[in-house]
Amino acid sequence: LPICANGSTNCHQIPLDDLFERVVKLAHRIHSLTSDMFNEFDERYAQGRGFISRAINNCHTSSLTTPEDKEQAQKFHHDDLLRLVMKVLRSWNDPLLQLVSEVPQGIGEAPGTILWKVTEVEDQTKQLIEGMEKILGRMHPNGLDNEVLSLWPMPMAMHAGDGSKLFAFYNLLHCFRRDSFKIDSYLKLLRCRLFHEGGC
């Protein structure tokens, strides 16, 4: 479901709390899809290969300082959390584009469910970025310092051996599952903090 059903020009007519509700639902949907996709890939391709031990702390977004749990996130000002959500989201533009283009070639026998989910996640992440940009524009009409970082170091080595290709896919899915959970959690906390009285 698009953040702004009648196009971006209609966003100014939607209450800010409603916009926030929409991005929270979209972020949760993305995390759910990503978790399903990772679990399917893990079960089908990664069993017995020891990928998880190699994937820990091997994400291209690891250089970003992010709160690890709700208690840590509570210590962040809401503007800092908004900036962080945008940094993490934008850092996934290139990796998701490559996943969409490379999965059919890199995993020729990949089931249609994985191919569909990769495309769906990439499309919905674009929608989420658009929704967050609308929210930031409403909350900070004069702009919010939000530099765009290029954290994606290089394309995956798609012509390497099968094990290396599979690990490259596994690692990306593992990392996006981790980051999509953080985005989902931070947005739920922000919604609660900004619009719900009585504490979070």
Swiss-Prot record:
The gene is prl. Transmembrane segments: none annotated. Pituitary gland. This is Prolactin. Belongs to the somatotropin/prolactin family. It comes from the Eukaryota. It is found in: Secreted. One of its GO terms (biological process) is positive regulation of receptor signaling pathway via JAK-STAT. Disulfide bonds join 4-11, 59-175, 192-200. Keywords: Disulfide bond, Hormone, Secreted. SUPFAM superfamilies: 4-helical cytokines. The keyword Disulfide bond applies. One of its GO terms (cellular component) is extracellular space. One of its GO terms (molecular function) is hormone activity. Pfam families: Hormone_1. Gene3D superfamilies: 1.20.1250.10. The lineage of its organism: Eukaryota, Metazoa, Chordata, Craniata, Vertebrata.
